[in-house]
Amino acid sequence: FKAYENVAQAMGGAMSTTGVPEGAPFVTGAQIGDSGTGLHLAIGLLAALHQANRTGQGQYVEVAMMDGVMNLCRVKFRDHQRLTRQELGEYSVPTYQGMGDVPRAGNDSGGGQLGNAIHCRPHGPNDWIYVVVQEAVWEALAKRIGPEVHHPDLATDPDLAKIADRRRHQAKMWGLLGKF
């Protein structure tokens, strides 16, 4: 059967994870269905060739674009499983244990880490960087940027010192990072 990228993204679950809260889902421009299907086909063909070399028997290899998309969405699917046990504190939108669906969360990182797109210098229309703020790097990052954003005590700011604090005060953290 023929497959179409945007339909595969919808059926494979990718669209349910993109977009902004309370808004329409988005298809990604990255063409994950086309590329993901090709990658999965290549893996299947290599496995079939290995089988043929070992046994002399060939195999029929079939891939579905929707399956390729689903595999590439595995982090969001893991977040869906995590929601059965806990809130997802890295999201900038509220989550709670047992809520069901992973929220469309704009540029939030998911997967347990705080992340977002930051408008950076010189603040032109295409001057963006994606930042993931892991616990292991926060102190060094805060000490580096703090003085430049007129917040020399950023590393020890009670709103931002610990990961739980940064989760509660993400808007403040992203705002300061955006000034850097």
Residue ranges of predicted features:
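Aromatic-enriched alpha-helical interface/lid elements that frame and gate functional surfaces
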Residues: 114-180
